Amino acid sequence: MKYILSIDQGTTSSRAIVFDKHANIKGLAQKEFTQIYPQPSWVEHDPTEIWGSQLGVITEALANSRILPNEVDAIGITNQRETTVIWEKSTGKPIYNAIVWQDRRTAKICDQLTKEGKDKIILEKTGLVLDSYFSGTKILWILDNVEGARQKAENGELCFGTIDTWLLWNLTQKKVHATDYSNASRTLLLNIKTLEWDDELLKILNIPKAILPELKESSTIYGETDKSIFGAEIPIAGIAGDQFAATFGQACLKKGMAKNTYGTGCFLTVNIGKEPIINHERLLTSIAWGRKKTVTYVLEGSVFIGGAVIQWLRDGLEFFRKSSDAESLASSASDNGGVYFVPAFVGLGAPHWDSYARGTIIGITRGSTKAHITRAALESIAFQSFDILNTMKKSIPNFEIKELRVDGGASQNNLLMQFQADLLECKVVRPKITETTALGAAYLAGLASGYWQSAEEIISLWQVDKIFEPSMPKNQKEKLLENWNRAIERSKSWIQNSNSL
């Protein structure tokens, strides 16, 4: 019997999951790693710690599954996107910490480029808004702020990669420096129409082409693990950024299908087929995956703070000991008591894109309790997702959402899922296997290795766990949305001095 090993390198933890042919989980392991906050709005990770934690959980997951490395048919990698690592080619040593997707330090660089009109060129070529969220300005910052980095980059002595590339480099012991189209489409450097690194974009961001990885399809053989690591050479056969892997794992393989992942942030994607739609409503067009010599595009809205707001209530305010306790606490209040929570801790993502917004809890009275604030925090996740889907409806011709497939840790929260169905006025469907990000990476790897034969086989493996039907009266929903919109306007442009970022 053979299995697929999925590497799921996330924002707060490294995970590894072993799947069998029926997409059942045979074993898994997870390890949290250090979040580094050198200054307000700066977020970093130690790339060496990421690699070490990932290696540890792979070994543990295989042990938990009671399988040997030579029983693994192929490895799939999925990863937090945009997070940027630059390392020395000769030593493999990072020259700076990984700058995380949440990091806002390059907001001023983006402002300056926007003043110069570069945002329009970037949008047309990449499908992305010009924002510090993406890798491009993070690379620029490292090259300009680490001593000697720019000269080394010009000399071809450095490698850039998103986390998938960093893991691939280490798994193959420096043999493979590559990425897939989905991760590349989040760098501000890939032309999503030509599927090539774009010279004009590289010039705008002053980034030498020599540091960039090779571009490959998401479902293809990248190379093999070095024998020194697991004692076996295992094919690495699938790579996709986390939200794109989740879209694949949710079997949203047909045009018009939508999924929302409720993780650290929220990420709502709609499959828009084989042709990109460049969106002018501040949503993102990206490549979801490339396979069989074609690419599939998605329209995406990204919420920076989703489930992380519950982590903050747990760790920052100590409202409860476990994140899973949030639902029972929130349910102890019949409604939000007039409290609205805009968790703009690092600014606002789609469709607002305001780096200068900050968190707001509004509507508090003497009668407000921990339960009201927790409920408002949970509701904020659904409100932000509603804002995105509402914008998508305006952006995609004849788009009508019939169901939203959901996954991620917070999708286990029934209160949140019901509230989401009520706001969207559509079915919210949770699958039996909610590890859809890891599963998507496994599917991409297994299709490339021949473990699974076709997309139809993947679709047949998807199964429903629970369906949430909308039940809220329309006038109640409209009042909630009206107050949410008032709250979100209060949070915008809070920081007036950009040096405070």
UniProtKB/Swiss-Prot annotation:
It comes from the Bacteria. InterPro entries: ATPase_NBD (IPR043129), Carb_kinase_FGGY (IPR000577), Carb_kinase_FGGY_CS (IPR018483), FGGY_C (IPR018485), FGGY_N (IPR018484), Glycerol_kin (IPR005999). Disulfide bonds: none annotated. Inhibited by fructose 1,6-bisphosphate (FBP). Its EC number is 2.7.1.30. Keywords: ATP-binding, Glycerol metabolism, Kinase, Nucleotide-binding, Transferase. Glycerol binds at residues 81-82, 133, 242-243. The keyword Lipid metabolism does not apply. It catalyses: glycerol + ATP = sn-glycerol 3-phosphate + ADP + H(+). ADP binds at residues 11, 15, 264, 307, 409, 413. ATP binds at residues 11-13, 264, 307, 311, 409. GO terms for molecular function: ATP binding; glycerol kinase activity. HAMAP family: Glycerol_kin. Belongs to the FGGY kinase family. Key enzyme in the regulation of glycerol uptake and metabolism. Catalyzes the phosphorylation of glycerol to yield sn-glycerol 3-phosphate. PANTHER family: GLYCEROL KINASE, SUGAR KINASE. This is Glycerol kinase. It comes from Borrelia garinii subsp. bavariensis (strain ATCC BAA-2496 / DSM 23469 / PBi) (Borreliella bavariensis).
